[in-house]
């Protein structure tokens, strides 16, 4: 059994699903990368998607790239914890690897939208911790979308229009982080994860630990 299985203080715990959502360009992908790089015991959920692979992406690392027929079969077999249709493509989270991680005390990071978060909450409410990342202003969000130079002006306009709808779901999340500065936002998100890992109900080995402590105190 590893330190992650037992928790960092030696007490066994169940893993959690740590969800980051935001409008495109608000910073959730950058924050997800920083969490994976800097936080021990956290792995990124690899989504299945029907969208084309982008330059530099690796199948199985960034996404599991599948065709529409394969994705439909996964939905039919209930192999996905959540799935959504976004910008003419399907995205979904395979169930089996997440279940295995949580059972062994490891945490799984989800970079998904509000639709996926709703589905996760419906299926596994006690395991889900959700964080919505907001930009400091609409102008700042548009500037970020232009700066990353990934999309045409038409696509950026579409993303800005969609952002208004996505932001309307902010109150469905457990925590809200306003990303004015990426380092400050990361510190806030990391603090949320640290606190949630210590929740009593997730620490499955706590009862046995306290009983043993009581036994020692009473002898």
Swiss-Prot record:
It catalyses: GMP + ATP = GDP + ADP. Belongs to the guanylate kinase family. It comes from Nitrobacter winogradskyi (strain ATCC 25391 / DSM 10237 / CIP 104748 / NCIMB 11846 / Nb-255). It is an enzyme of class 2 (transferase). HAMAP family: Guanylate_kinase. Its EC number is 2.7.4.8. This is Guanylate kinase. The keyword Hydrolase does not apply. The gene is gmk. One of its GO terms (molecular function) is ATP binding. Essential for recycling GMP and indirectly, cGMP.
């Amino acid at each position: 059994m590893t330190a992650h299985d037992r928790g960092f203080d030696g007490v066994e715990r169940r893993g959690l699903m740590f969800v980051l959502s935001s409008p495109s360009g608000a910073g959730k992908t950058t924050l997800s990368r920083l969490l994976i790089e800097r936080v021990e015991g956290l792995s990124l959920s690899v989504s299945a998607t029907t969208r084309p692979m982008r330059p530099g992406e690796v199948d199985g690392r960034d996404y599991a790239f599948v065709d529409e027929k394969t994705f439909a079969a996964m939905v039919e077999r209930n192999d996905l914890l959540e799935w959504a249709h976004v910008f003419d493509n399907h995205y979904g989270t395979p169930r089996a690897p997440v279940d295995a991680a949580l059972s062994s005390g490891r945490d799984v990071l989800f970079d998904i939208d509000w639709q996926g978060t709703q589905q996760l909450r419906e299926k596994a409410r006690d395991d889900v911790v959700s964080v919505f990342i907001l930009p400091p202003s609409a102008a700042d969000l548009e500037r970020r979308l232009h700066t990353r130079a990934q999309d045409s002006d038409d696509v950026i306009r579409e993303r800005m229009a969609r952002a208004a709808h996505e932001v309307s779901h902010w109150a469905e999340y457990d925590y809200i982080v306003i990303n004015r500065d990426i380092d400050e936002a990361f510190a806030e998100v990391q603090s949320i994860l640290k606190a949630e890992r210590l929740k009593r109900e997730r620490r499955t080995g706590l009862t046995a630990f306290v009983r043993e402590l009581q036994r020692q105190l009473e002898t």
